[in-house]
Amino acid sequence: MMKKRVKRVLFKISGEALSDGDSSNRISEERLSRLIAELKVVRNADVEVALVIGGGNILRGLSQSQSLQINRVSADQMGMLATLINGMALADALKTEDVPNLLTSTLSCPQLAELYNPQKASDALSQGKVVICTMGAGAPYLTTDTGAALRACELKVDVLLKATMHVDGVYDQDPRECADAVRYDHISYRDFLSQGLGAIDPAAISLCMEAGIPIKMFSFARHSLEEAVFNTVGTVISSTEGGQL
């Protein structure tokens, strides 16, 4: 169990968490309902909740750039738009469940979302609203991980929780390719960077290291958001011995 009282968290949720894998069903009703229900549980535990949503269920900028010969900048911008689509779905679903929320965009889309402002977002969190951050870092060549780390620093969260669908933490090798890969329960920021581990963008690690914000990477396929916040699951990346948050 975490020893530190967790008051404010930021989830980085992959777009794949909203998809059931069917190419014709980019946003699954079942997956969306599960995510909304679990966000409600965490919020009802008196935790302030922000989240950064990916767009990989709709489009991956780098992959599209390579496969369709689209300019990298344009492809990344298309990927950012995909995160806004997912964010709009989340905002409406939360509203349907009477969960107050603020949908924000790093880039200006005034008819669709409020332009992200750190102070307004922080105030909304203090008021009990779920803050949804879309458009990643707002610039090409920067990953959604980096965008999540930026938001985590600006909002002064207690922990950044990265939910994935394929692995349950940070390994010394890719567990999908190496059967003898070993998962870390805890690893320091510096060891993560020096070993060149690829589970999280190194720019995101560096930002969180400077701000002293621990990162927990866990499997959303195996664990609930509540478990990720309050229990010992996945891998903790921090400077604290033993990974206690």
Curated annotation (Swiss-Prot):
A GO term for molecular function: UMP kinase activity
Subcellular compartments: Cytoplasm
GO cellular component: cytoplasm
Keywords: ATP-binding, Cytoplasm, Kinase, Nucleotide-binding, Pyrimidine biosynthesis, Transferase
Reactions listed under catalytic activity: UMP + ATP = UDP + ADP
EC identifiers of the protein: 2.7.4.22
Taxonomic superkingdom: Bacteria
UniProt pathway annotation: Pyrimidine metabolism; CTP biosynthesis via de novo pathway; UDP from UMP (UMPK route): step 1/1
SUPFAM superfamilies reported for this sequence: Carbamate kinase-like
Chief localization: cytoplasm
Binding site for ATP: K12, I13, S14, G15, G56, R60, T164, Y171, D174
Disulphide bonds in the chain: none
An example Gene Ontology biological process: UDP biosynthetic process
Activity modulation comment: Inhibited by UTP.
CDD domains per the UniProt record, alphabetical: AAK_UMPK-PyrH-Ec
Enzyme class: transferase
Pfam families cross-referenced by the UniProt entry: AA_kinase (PF00696)
Binding site for UMP: G55, D76, A137, G138, A139, P140, Y141, L142, T143, T144
Functional description taken from the UniProt entry: Catalyzes the reversible phosphorylation of UMP to UDP.
Subunit relationships: Homohexamer.
UniProt similarity note: Belongs to the UMP kinase family.
PANTHER family, per the entry: URIDYLATE KINASE (PTHR42833), URIDYLATE KINASE PUMPKIN, CHLOROPLASTIC (PTHR42833:SF4)
Protein name (Swiss-Prot/TrEMBL): Uridylate kinase
Organism of origin: Chlamydia trachomatis serovar D (strain ATCC VR-885 / DSM 19411 / UW-3/Cx)
Lineage, uppermost ranks: Bacteria, Pseudomonadati, Chlamydiota, Chlamydiia, Chlamydiales
